[in-house]
Structures are given as C-alpha cells and as structure tokens.
C-alpha cells in the first residue's frame, strides 16, 4: 500500500493511486471495463497491478523488485533489488489505423475484453473495425485439486478437511468442498492448496519461448458479509471487503491474469479465512501476442527538454491516416496541438486520451 503513490524518480509515471480525488473514467476502466485484481479493501486504493496485459497496454516497461518478475528481464541489480525490463510494453503515445469500435469491443467476453487492447485500439462507434477483429485465441481449462488434497465425498465431489466430522457429517474446522461450478469454503485459518491446470479441449501446441498466462475469473458469495474475504492465486490477491466498511470495494468478481513459468502446469491457491462460495469459474490459458508494428505503427518521440510541468512535447512520423492513442486517462480539459494547430480530443480505449 505504501507504494501506490511512490515514484523512484521525477521522470517516472505510474498506474496506481491512493487518493480521494481520482479520474472516474480510469477507475471505471480498471474495475468494470478491464477488470483488474483488487488486493485492498478500500475502493479508493487503485493498486499496482500484476496483470501482464494491463502492464503491457499501459507501457509499464520497468519494474523495481526484490525478486524475479515473470515476463521481465533483469537489466540491473543493486544488492537484493533489481530493475526488470519488458521490451514488449506499449509506447505511451502512438498512431494507428488498426482499430475496433466500442460497439464490437462491448461484445467481447472474458478474457478477450482484456487482450483486445494488445491487438487493437478501441475507438468511436462511427469507425469501421479492422480485419474483422481477428484476435489471438485462448484455450478453456479447468482447475482441479492436486491428488494429495482430495478425499471422496459422494457423487464425485471432493473435500479437503482440516478438523473433524461428527456422526451427521457436519464439517467443522476448515474445509473446502469442490463443487461442479466452483468451491465452497469454510476456513477458520488461511489454507493453501495446489491445483492442476487441465485442458478442456484437445491440447494445443505451445511454441518454444512463449510464456503462458492463466486467465481466471469467479464470483464470490460471502456468507459472512460483515467480514472480508480474500483469495490468492500464485501470490496475487483479490479481496472483497466487509459490506459495512466505509470504503466498501464491491469486488464480488475476482479476476486474475497469472503469468506462469515455463512448463508450469499447477497453481497455488490460498483461501483466506471466512465462509464463502466461489462459483461461475472461467479459466483460460494461452500466450500473449507479440508486440506488433501493425498496432503500434508510429511512435511518439518525446522531447524531454521541452516536456515539463503539465505539458508533453514530441514528434511523430505518421505512416497512415488513423488515430492518435495514449495511455493518459481522458479528461475534457486536455488540449492537443498538432503542427501548432489545436486538434479536437476524443476518448479512446474506453477511458483514455
């Protein structure tokens, strides 16, 4: 939480903020449109995200970390702290004619509502989309408890129990019941379980060097609404705050995008304390598309000497007529000048300038 507003250098830009004054378009994009993980109980805390799609889209090229960052390469280290780089990160500003209309975007289901931003710019309704919106496909998968956590419990359902059962099979202590569409949890303490990732369809071939991303979403029904609920996937936390919390976060759908290491086919799921049910599970596996000049056709070269205060200046050589895209949250008070002439600004990617 301490890092939400912290920068390491005056020239650094960040995607997180903790403030009562915020850009509503950006917050809606994070929480509703795109669907980022929400690790904090306070709705005002727009966290640093570990979602690799969001990081690429927002141009997060560098991460400072005390441990390895999947998808990023170490470029410098000072004692335990390293600087990690991802050359696939999007430019902060670029021009393109590879677009998708908002109408088409709004039809996309999870996880394509996230990954579309790596292949198209989403623009106004009056523009025709490019290439019938052809996108990288992701394979449906299922998650099953590893064998060492399974115990038969009738009708094929499985339960992992910590504690005792009485003669009426009433479960006490901590237990996790695997249901057809999710899990039912009664945890008096935090419990970590390993799950295997299984292909639902015929297994697809992964090209060497391509890192896999597990996209996971499920609904949370909290049986004790006056208590927080948290679930970690490979250390990535989502939290639903107690309903009576003054800054209740309304995070009733937990969404994750989990980078996997090469050859990794299991995940660690940590169930937080509480009594709750996780249902409507959606899980997909696949690799992100390579950084493409088809989307990032012309990149802005920022003039650091002329860029200061609330003004950014730079040059761009536009190859095709199209749209100017940034990762700056949209606001009606921005002004844009091209070759010295003021140009009308529009909202792109549903929330950006």
PLM regions and their residue ranges:
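Hydrophobic, well-ordered secondary-structure elements that form the walls
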Residues: 11, 63, 84, 314, ...
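Periplasmic/luminal catalytic loop of GT-C fold multi-pass membrane glycosyltransferases
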Residues: 37-81, 85-87
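Composition- and surface-driven signal marking solvent-exposed, interaction-prone regions
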Residues: 68-80, 97-98, 229-232, 329, ...
């Amino acid at each position: 939480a301490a890092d939400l507003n912290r920068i390491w250098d005056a020239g650094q830009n960040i995607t997180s903020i903790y403030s009562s004054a915020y850009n509503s378009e950006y917050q809606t994009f994070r929480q509703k449109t795109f669907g980022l993980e929400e690790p904090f109980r306070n709705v005002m805390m727009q966290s640093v995200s570990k979602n690799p799609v969001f990081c690429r889209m927002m141009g997060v090229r560098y991460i400072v970390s005390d441990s390895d960052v999947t998808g990023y390469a170490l470029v410098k280290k000072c004692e335990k702290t390293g600087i990690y780089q991802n050359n696939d990160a999007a430019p902060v500003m670029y021009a393109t004619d590879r677009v998708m209309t908002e109408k088409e975007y709004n039809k996309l289901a999870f996880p394509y509502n996230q990954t579309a931003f790596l292949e198209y710019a989403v623009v106004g309704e009056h523009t025709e989309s490019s290439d019938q919106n052809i996108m990288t496909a992701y394979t449906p998968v299922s998650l099953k408890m590893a064998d060492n956590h399974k115990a038969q419990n009738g009708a094929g359902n499985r339960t992992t129990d910590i504690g005792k059962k009485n003669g009426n099979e009433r479960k006490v202590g901590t237990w996790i019941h695997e249901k057809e569409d999710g899990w039912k949890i009664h945890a008096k303490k935090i419990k970590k379980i390993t799950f295997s990732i299984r292909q639902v369809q015929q297994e697809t071939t992964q090209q060497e060097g391509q890192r896999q991303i597990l996209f996971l979403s499920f609904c949370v029904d909290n049986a004790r609404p006056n208590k927080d609920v948290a679930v970690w996937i490979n250390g990535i936390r989502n939290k639903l705050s107690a309903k009576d919390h003054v800054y209740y976060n309304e995070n009733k759908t937990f969404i994750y995008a989990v980078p996997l290491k090469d050859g990794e086919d299991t995940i660690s799921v940590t169930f937080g304390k509480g009594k709750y049910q996780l249902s409507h599970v959606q899980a997909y596996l696949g690799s992100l598309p390579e950084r493409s000049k088809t989307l990032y056709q012309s990149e802005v070269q920022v003039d650091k000497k002329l860029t200061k205060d609330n003004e950014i200046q730079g040059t761009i050589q536009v190859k095709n007529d199209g749209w100017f895209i940034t990762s700056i949250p949209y606001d009606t008070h921005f002004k844009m000048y091209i070759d010295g002439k003021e140009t009308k600004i529009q909202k792109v990617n549903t929330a950006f300038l």
